[in-house]
């Protein structure tokens, strides 16, 4: 079962919470303070945004910290306006028990640069209730992330 707006407000910890981001069946996550483009970590908050050049992969941190109960998971989709500009998002499930900011992977498939402004809504997350709590909720490598998290596979 997907959670409606009033249950999201009541049951899911989202910090900082924005009423404008709350949707009927989801929540619009905003561009946070860090990004990774062309091998460099960028301060998005200080610069006011991040530019993703054509044919370039990027990681973008969400402004929001999300904390999920052990019986709720998240499914994310890129906002359609950004897809129409050429962005493609590759997002994993957000497992039950997750707590932290999310690092999201984007690819600019277009021939034009795409700019994301700090605080701009860019991905919607929908929350899905499981039949019961997970026996093994998420407690993995990225739990508690507050900053951009690069892959831990290459370490």
UniProtKB/Swiss-Prot annotation:
DCTP binds at residues 79-84, 95, 124, 138. Pfam families: DCD. Pathway: Pyrimidine metabolism; dUMP biosynthesis; dUMP from dCTP (dUTP route): step 1/2. It catalyses: dCTP + H2O + H(+) = dUTP + NH4(+). Its EC number is 3.5.4.13. GO terms for molecular function: dCTP deaminase activity; nucleotide binding. One of its GO terms (biological process) is dUMP biosynthetic process. Keywords: Hydrolase, Nucleotide metabolism, Nucleotide-binding. It comes from the Archaea. Catalyzes the deamination of dCTP to dUTP. Belongs to the dCTP deaminase family. Homotrimer. This is dCTP deaminase. The gene is dcd.
């Amino acid at each position: 079962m997907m959670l409606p707006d009033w249950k999201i407000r009541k049951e899911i910890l989202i910090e900082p919470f924005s009423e404008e981001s709350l949707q009927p069946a989801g929540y619009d996550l905003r561009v946070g303070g860090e990004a990774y483009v062309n091998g460099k970590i960028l301060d998005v908050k200080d610069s006011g945004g991040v530019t993703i050049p054509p044919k370039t992969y990027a990681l973008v941190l969400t402004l929001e910290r999300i904390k999920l109960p052990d019986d709720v998971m998240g499914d994310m989709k890129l906002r359609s306006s950004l897809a129409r500009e050429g962005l493609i998002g590759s997002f994993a499930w957000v497992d039950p028990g997750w707590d932290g900011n999310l690092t999201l992977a984007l690819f600019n498939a277009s021939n034009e640069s795409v700019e994301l402004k700090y605080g701009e809504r860019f991905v919607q997350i929908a929350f899905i209730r499981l039949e019961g709590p997970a026996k093994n909720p998420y407690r993995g490598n990225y739990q508690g992330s507050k900053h951009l998290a690069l892959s831990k596979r290459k370490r």
